[in-house]
């Protein structure tokens, strides 16, 4: 019997769905997959029931910040009500925190490439086991700017390494493996439009340099170790700026690499807390920093509302 118009459309939409692509044939043969750092397992949790409706995943370093974000986005989407709580789904561990409101998942990733890398392995597998499709994942965070007014929001065009190359290098079984750091260009433009819609703060699109360290790795002069001069630092940061780098953080390269490899549409949106050409230490008043940190949340919250037709 021929399909009805509605059935045919549903079938077409199903064929157009973009599912998670694990680049690991071993997973399919496993009877149980323990996501140790989330305190979740395929044998003890029903992932499709828990996460099957997720369409937007937002990740950030701080667990408290991601808890604040889920409350904010829930209110924006009309999912909140007085007294509503958003329990930590990973409450059995203190490594990461995870919160959910409707189609939005909010997950903390800690600080630096190793921490976010571990989280992403388990998050991507979790979404795969939940049979999620058409996922958009966005890192929202803080960074140091280069030549930007503090409080500016940078939407990452390309994640680059300390030599300004769009590469992520990892040692695997004693060998160097280099992968690209591609992000979704269309998603960048959608976020740019959302920033224009809001028109609340300075925004730029630029490259984001991802480093392994907060101090020497970012050319700071105020760490316990420093083997270079102020002149050396300025020369390096100006070279980075000339290469299109507008901010510096410690997670974007592995985030871009892993999301791209697994078929996830991904973006990075970070606020700058200072201009590194002007100094190294963050001495902005606390209340100002809190407002700065809300800027990526407001931008991404508006993007989610707009994507769901609720803006």
From Swiss-Prot:
Xref: CDD domains: UP_hUPP-like
Activity regulation as described: Strongly inhibited by 2,2'-anhydro-5-ethyluridine, a competitive inhibitor.
GO biological process: cellular response to glucose starvation; CMP catabolic process; dCMP catabolic process; dTMP catabolic process; dUMP catabolic process; pyrimidine nucleotide metabolic process; UMP catabolic process; UMP salvage
Effect of inactivating the gene: Homozygous knockout mice are completely viable and show no changes in growth, development, sexual maturation, and fertility. There are no significant histological alterations present in the major organs including brain, lung, heart, liver, spleen, gut, and kidney. However, uridine concentration increases by more than 6-fold in the plasma and in tissues and 24-fold in urine. Moreover, pyrimidine nucleotide metabolism is more generally disturbed. An effect on thymidine metabolism is not reproducibly observed.
Pathway: Pyrimidine metabolism; UMP biosynthesis via salvage pathway; uracil from uridine (phosphorylase route): step 1/1
Catalytic activity: uridine + phosphate = alpha-D-ribose 1-phosphate + uracil; 2'-deoxyuridine + phosphate = 2-deoxy-alpha-D-ribose 1-phosphate + uracil
Ligand binding (phosphate): 61, 95, 139-142
Gene3D superfamilies in alphabetical order: Nucleoside phosphorylase domain
PANTHER family referenced in this protein's UniProt entry, alphabetically: URIDINE PHOSPHORYLASE (PTHR43691), URIDINE PHOSPHORYLASE 1 (PTHR43691:SF10)
Job of this protein: Catalyzes the reversible phosphorylytic cleavage of uridine to uracil and ribose-1-phosphate which can then be utilized as carbon and energy sources or in the rescue of pyrimidine bases for nucleotide synthesis. Shows broad substrate specificity and can also accept deoxyuridine and other analogous compounds.
Name of this chain's protein: Uridine phosphorylase 1
Gene source species: Mus musculus (Mouse)
């Amino acid at each position: 019997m021929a399909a009805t118009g509605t059935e045919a459309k549903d079938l077409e939409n199903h064929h157009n769905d973009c599912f998670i692509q694990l680049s690991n044939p071993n997973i399919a043969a496993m009877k149980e997959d323990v996501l140790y750092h989330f305190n979740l397992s395929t044998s003890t949790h029903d992932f499709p029931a828990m996460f099957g409706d997720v369409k937007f995943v937002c990740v950030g370093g701080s667990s408290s910040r991601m808890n604040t974000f889920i409350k904010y986005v829930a209110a924006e989407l009309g999912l909140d009500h007085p007294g509503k709580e958003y329990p930590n789904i990973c409450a059995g561990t203190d490594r990461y925190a995870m919160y959910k409101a409707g189609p939005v998942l909010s997950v903390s990733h800690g600080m630096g490439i190793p921490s976010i890398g571990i989280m992403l392995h388990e998050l991507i597998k979790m979404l795969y086991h939940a049979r999620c499709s058409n996922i958009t994942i966005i890192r929202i965070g803080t960074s140091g700017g280069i030549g930007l007014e503090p409080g500016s929001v940078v939407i990452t065009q390309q994640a680059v390494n300390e030599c300004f190359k769009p590469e992520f290098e990892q040692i695997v079984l004693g060998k160097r493996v280099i992968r690209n750091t591609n992000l979704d260009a269309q998603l960048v433009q959608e976020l740019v439009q959302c920033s224009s819609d809001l028109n609340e703060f300075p925004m730029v699109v630029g490259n984001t340099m991802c480093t392994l360290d907060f101090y020497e790795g970012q050319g700071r002069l105020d760490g316990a170790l420093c083997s270079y001069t102020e002149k050396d630092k300025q020369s390096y940061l100006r070279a980075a700026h000339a290469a299109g780098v507008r901010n510096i953080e410690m997670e974007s390269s592995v985030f871009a690499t892993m999301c791209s490899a697994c078929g996830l549409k991904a973006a990075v949106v970070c606020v700058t807390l200072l201009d590194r050409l002007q100094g190294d230490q963050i001495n902005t008043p606390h209340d100002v920093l809190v407002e700065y940190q809300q800027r990526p949340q407001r931008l991404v919250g508006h993007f989610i509302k707009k994507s769901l037709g609720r803006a």
